[in-house]
Amino acid sequence: IRRLLAVWSAHCIKFACQLTGKQGATLAGKAALTLYPPILGELAREVKEDIFVVCGTNGKTTTNNLLASVLEGNHKKVVCNRTGSNMLNGVASAFVLNAGFSGHLKADYACIEVDEASTVKVFPHFQPDYMILTNLFRDQLDRYGEIDTTMELLAKAMGMAPHMKILANADDSLSAFLALEQENPHAFYGISQQVI
């Protein structure tokens, strides 16, 4: 019954926020996790196919939304945090607000943007099937100090999901290095020819 209460409360909070002109993208998730802490993991287990997470300094929201749009274009039901609310509460909101009033989720896939430092908070709730790593640059220094800190957090999260396949940007040396250093299965993507 706490799970139902958490889902209903999240939907009510989202509705109230919309009435007041606010998004409420993280508040609904925070309330759901407070009322029923295992809700994120339980809903994630109801995803029928794969869970993708997108991490990186730049391009997370665009990459995540493009992936979700491709899947939806193939008539798949997708959980996606399209607004870029990419910390634990925002991730929880994406799942909870896609759950029906029965408290259950009917989704084929999940495409979830996750802030690099939040991966270690999100992955205890569920282990993704894939991580798409866009790039790693120093523009996050204001939040995390050295880029090494960001890489250490990502490496720790990757270790928490040992079967997760890492899809890393081969054109970004830090992303490629990080993927190669892990025991996770990995593959690379990039631009194969000079475009400029």
Language-model features, listed with the residues they occupy:
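Conserved nucleotide-sensing/catalytic segment adjacent to the nucleotide-binding pocket
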Residues: G90-L133
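Residue-level preference for the first positions of well-ordered beta-strands
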Residues: I51, D108-C111, K165
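Acidic, Mg2+-coordinating active-site environments of NTP-dependent enzymes
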Residues: E49, F137-I196
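Hydrophobic/aromatic beta-strand patches that form the interior of the parallel beta-sheet core
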Residues: F52, V79, Y130-I132, L167, ...
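Gly-rich Lys/Arg/Thr-decorated short loops/hinges at beta-loop-alpha junctions or inter-strand turns
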Residues: E72-G73, D129-R138
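Walker A (P-loop) phosphate-binding motif
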Residues: P37-G84, A155
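Short, structured coil segments at secondary-structure junctions
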Residues: N74, F126-Q127, E181-N184
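Short, basic phosphate-binding NTP loop
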Residues: I1-V53, E72-N74, N89-A99
